[in-house]
């Protein structure tokens, strides 16, 4: 089997395709959450804290010199990233919780009793015939 055929067989498996779709949706969801935090959540929090723009919060370690940019610790952006992570982690937690509850409901359902085999059916008929003979 050639390398291309092996790759084609690998890529066409359901799990790989499902994983790729999940990664793409996850990346898009991450962008939505980042925008939600930066554009909707942080501005009101900044106003409450006295007009602070969180993306500008930083500590300058070394001022800019000539063409070299300043060396800063941008803790405001870090705070936004932590909030992004918290929202995404909570959304994943809620999704997994829903999936697990569905799995539990499926597990709790009693399994259907298997259909009797031909041997069992024959034995049941013999039993019924013997009971009928004893009753006479």
Swiss-Prot record:
It comes from the Bacteria. Keywords: Cell inner membrane, Cell membrane, Ion channel, Ion transport, Membrane, Transmembrane, Transmembrane helix, Transport. One of its GO terms (biological process) is monoatomic ion transport. GO terms for cellular component: membrane; plasma membrane. The chain crosses the membrane at residues 9-29, 32-52, 54-74, 79-99. One of its GO terms (molecular function) is mechanosensitive monoatomic ion channel activity. It is a multi-pass membrane protein. Pfam families: MscL. It is found in: Cell inner membrane. SUPFAM superfamilies: Gated mechanosensitive channel (SSF81330). Homopentamer. Belongs to the MscL family. Channel that opens in response to stretch forces in the membrane lipid bilayer. May participate in the regulation of osmotic pressure changes within the cell. This is Large-conductance mechanosensitive channel. The lineage of its organism: Bacteria, Pseudomonadati, Pseudomonadota, Gammaproteobacteria, Alteromonadales.
